[in-house]
Amino acid sequence: MKLGFYLLGGDFMRLAIIDYDRCQPKKCSMECMKYCPGVRMGEKTIEIDENTGKPVISEVLCSGCGICVKRCPFKAISIIGLPEELSEDKIVHSYGQNRFKLFGLVIPRDGVVGIIGQNGIGKSTVLRILAGELIPNLGKHDKEPNYDDVIKYFRGTELQEYFEKLKNKGVKAIHKVQYVDILPKVVKGKVGDLLKKVDEKGKFDEVVEKLELKNILDRELSQLSGGELQRVAIAAAYLRNGDIYFFDEPSSWLDIRQRFNAARLIRELNKVVVVEHDLIVLDYLSDYIHIMYGVPSAYGIVSMPKSVRVGINEYLYGELREENIRFRKEPIIFEKRAVIDFKNRPILLSYSSMKKTLGDFKLEVSGGTIYKGEVIGILGPNGIGKTTFVKLLAGVIKPDEGEVIKEGDIKVSYKPQYITPDYDGTVEDLLSSITNIHTSYYKSEIINPLQLEKLLDREVRELSGGELQRVAIAACLSRDADIYLLDEPSAFLDVEQRLRVSKVIRRIADEKEAGMFVVDHDILFQDYISDRFIVFSGEPGKFGVGSSPMNKRDGANKFLKEMQITFRRDPETGRPRANKEGSQRDIMQKEKGEYYYVDE
């Protein structure tokens, strides 16, 4: 079994990667050059770029000693060894010397091809190349990239014909981009007018109904929420006639019902490539899977195409069996948790039936209790009152009727749904203001699993959405509290980050005997962490009704019945899988009233 990376020395290609956002030559003594053995012997292993004033490392002259990695005060340098089969002539695209490199490409085909991988591994780059927005440079920076070289490179493969069509404008590609929040900056107008303008199929009314867009047709794009923008972007892509469609993270901002509505619509298209971090949605959507692995921001490798079940399972195991490559040291396995009778444990918090009116929205919640060490997952559509309920528990707002009863001096820690980077200082400053972060326990339980080591010296205001989310989760869980309230902790996180966060939440609940309320739309995430469910139903934006905490099976069954989605559990990994609508298993489970998973 070959280890895909984490190697130094030997007969293989070496990558020297510099994070130029972290590199600050004006604030250091150029330790990378000062201590480099090659430079000290008079070689040009590291030189200063005249334009940027920042170092450039020669991957040919670099010996791979790793001294610059250890000496750099800003942790900006990585030296990574690759297996010899990943030689320089296997590079499909490079963003420059000492920058990200992509090996391999996804093969478009009829049906839906899904791509799974960490953030920063090159998934969006693959989509841009296949959509004709970026001509791959094959790792050559000394001349402008052109399709003739690309066609020659892929000669004899399925991609040769595809790039020939791209060159001759013979492929009409429709691309739904990842960051839909930028759309109001480049497109102006009302939703209905914009969708009618791009409708080339005469399916405007059908799409409006399927994606539940009727109530926002008269609104300006600039007035829409993230979830509304996402649905409009998906609708606009679907309504256009194309030879191939690309969807980059279509489930972001959407609730569970909206995710499956979008997935059903996307599956109607003939040829699709989709990037998605919600494993259940990806499984439901796709006919084939490509795994992308490597080192984020350094290099990414595209696997051969695989069947959906095999592809997702191999990703979770961290092992490509046909290629005989292991790319992750530890597999991700969803152990079945024993059902615990929490009623034998002390009560942390209880609440009576509560009512709250906010403007035109009315919320009613049945009473309930949370016990020590219990995690309660909160399920329901957007705009149904889940966040309002969490705010009632946190004491951020008061109920109009009813009360929250804390048993003794109970402390509550709350991570809100929408996080604003309004802290002046570094991540280390923020976390240190809450607790002592320089202990071995904190490093092993929070810093390492949430991958915060390289963020500690970063300014909070400069963090991306996913980075800010991980810091906010760490801040919430670092507080000395008895109950933790987390609103959509999986938002902006990739597959592996979501699974790490779920394990951190579960471990803290078990070890500290803390109570947890978790709102999230990722069913796999909720299935892993939760002991019981609270289910919200109603009419979004008008009224919401929250149940009392229910056992996991009954709660999930109630929720999925409302969604008209059935689940089974994969026998190999234990992960929940959504049945394809209308399949034999889907029909059988609906007839039995068993919407939650059954074993295969």
Swiss-Prot record:
Residues 569-594 have a biased composition (Basic and acidic residues). Keywords: ATP-binding, Nucleotide-binding, Repeat, Transport. Residues 569-600 are annotated as: Disordered. Gene3D superfamilies: P-loop containing nucleotide triphosphate hydrolases (3.40.50.300). It comes from Methanocaldococcus jannaschii (strain ATCC 43067 / DSM 2661 / JAL-1 / JCM 10045 / NBRC 100440) (Methanococcus jannaschii). ATP 2 binds at G380, P381, N382, G383, I384, G385, K386, T387. The keyword Acyltransferase does not apply. This is Uncharacterized ABC transporter ATP-binding protein MJ0719.
